[in-house]
Amino acid sequence: MDGIKYAVFTDKGVRLLGKNQYTSNVESGSTRTEIKHWVELFFGVKVQAMNSHRLPGKGRRMGPIMGHTMHYRRMIITLQPGYSIPPLRKKRT
């Protein structure tokens, strides 16, 4: 259950919600089958297709040393018609 980090709500992510596609960042070591099984089990939905791509880490400098943050993977999950995932938002207090 540690595979999915958080949902992504960019312009493209919001546009894809109309096509029943959900975008989220996942652990870079997770496989498609692990994420598909976890989404179907946790949310009770049927996954039709999954697309993924790896995003590069950003460069970070600490004095003369140049480093970088960890890279991560972004998954676009397409659900079968009739299924949906409730919004994943934190409540504001």
Curated annotation (Swiss-Prot):
Keyword rRNA-binding: yes
Keywords of the record: Chloroplast, Plastid, Ribonucleoprotein, Ribosomal protein, RNA-binding, rRNA-binding
One annotated Gene Ontology cellular component of this protein: ribosome
Compartment(s): Plastid, Chloroplast
GO annotation, biological process: translation
Gene Ontology molecular-function annotations: mRNA binding; rRNA binding; structural constituent of ribosome
Quaternary data: Part of the 50S ribosomal subunit.
Entry-linked HAMAP family: Ribosomal_uL23_B
Task of the protein: Binds to 23S rRNA.
Family of the protein in this entry: Belongs to the universal ribosomal protein uL23 family.
This protein's name: Large ribosomal subunit protein uL23cz/uL23cy
Species, as recorded: Oenothera elata subsp. hookeri
